[in-house]
Curated annotation (Swiss-Prot):
The record marks 379 as: Increases nucleophilicity of active site Cys. The active site is at residues 468, 540. In the N-terminal section; belongs to the ThiD family. This is Hydroxymethylpyrimidine/phosphomethylpyrimidine kinase THI20. It comes from the Eukaryota. It comes from Saccharomyces cerevisiae (strain ATCC 204508 / S288c).
Amino acid sequence: MTYSTVSINTPPPYLTLACNEKLPTVLSIAGTDPSGGAGIEADVKTITAHRCYAMTCITALNAQTPVKVYSINNTPKEVVFQTLESNLKDMKCNVIKTGMLTAAAIEVLHEKLLQLGENRPKLVVDPVLVATSGSSLAGKDIVSLITEKVAPFADILTPNIPECYKLLGEERKVNGLQDIFQIAKDLAKITKCSNILVKGGHIPWNDEKEKYITDVLFLGAEQKFIIFKGNFVNTTHTHGTGCTLASAIASNLARGYSLPQSVYGGIEYVQNAVAIGCDVTKETVKDNGPINHVYAVEIPLEKMLSDECFTASDVIPKKPLKSAADKIPGGNFYEYLINHPKVKPHWDSYINHEFVKKVADGTLERKKFQFFIEQDYAYLVDYARVHCIAGSKAPCLEDMEKELVIVGGVRTEMGQHEKRLKEVFGVKDPDYFQKIKRGPALRAYSRYFNDVSRRGNWQELVASLTPCLMGYGEALTKMKGKVTAPEGSVYHEWCETYASSWYREAMDEGEKLLNHILETYPPEQLDTLVTIYAEVCELETNFWTAALEYE
């Protein structure tokens, strides 16, 4: 028998540049959730996702899933002692995070904190008293022990509303922020922990447009409240959010961030993990599914496979290429997108926007148009940056060159905005363009771009960039013959730009590019491109709406 030999270049050079990386360390003291969504398993995932080193001290072996807690089996006190003692003896520890605590674990931790004195690590206490599924995880004795023996050592306490009630020993009506402020102040007094984060996920609020949630951070030493307002995600899949948030805060503290920064970063991480979600439960589990802890984690093998220096193709052969274009009737992806049920409502509201009509007839207030030009100028900076990133991810030199040409065109468009602002609106300060303040609509758009840039591939970046190009042209094409703004006015000139023949040529190239990206995009993931296109059309609509509503 003849044997073949395959040589593989591993490890690649970029993995040998950082030797003995100094990772921040976080120790989680908590119970298990073998289904992986909460407890110590969620802690380890979260700590790792924040590029920190996770250590554990298991307080209870639980039989638990998102459905319910089936059983709780406490770890013997001597085992908890040995685990905590050995970890803190042999391992560095920047932050301790606690979750589900037993009476034995509290006694051991209390003694250790007293022993360490001023040398103890920072402490984040998530008073796990009630599971998201509604299961009680602690009796009155545990509540008292946490209050008396753990909370006074904590740098921050992170209860949700039901846990606040347990710690306070009473339920209260919560009708507004002042009620939450009072709860936080009372908790700080009872627990002797000066920093309290009251998590508001259990009580979404309503304003005129949408539901939202508020998390309130009380900084006792500064007598200050910081209110974090977040979008309410319409999902029941929130299993493990409390564990995850506390671990994210602990990880951020371990990385050297301040407490407010750490809380902000933790909240955003959890909101993203909830919004993105993950499909890991069986169909019988309708509620309280887990969140996506690893949404921002790279897959090492994918990074290796995309490396042109990778030589293990004999071991891992590339899959036969299937084209998503095969799923598009007529092969025109642009037409497919704008007529797709998920895209069409946002596309129609975008290209038929009242903003364009008011510019075309010259009735838009000057200050609103100036605001739009300023915001669009700042947007184009992001737009050019994403095209540069798209160029770096493009599969071939020709596609890279196209992205660079587009960036040059964007700079020309920015120059037109500079001219309008100087000649029409009297801008004279040379630093004016670097000082433009971004409005909420632009910030939302920019954050979306940042996310797609980090997580998306070349095709997904193209899908996110194309609605801007195509929508402006389509909107102004629909206004052909209807532009009544005086010739020579900034309004008329703006309309002429996007209705011009050269802009139509750019749109034709954009349409070709959309068809081109399908050639190498997996057909089973086509809905991802559809979703991106729909979401960006909605962002474009909101961008014009913001200009209309500017005061």
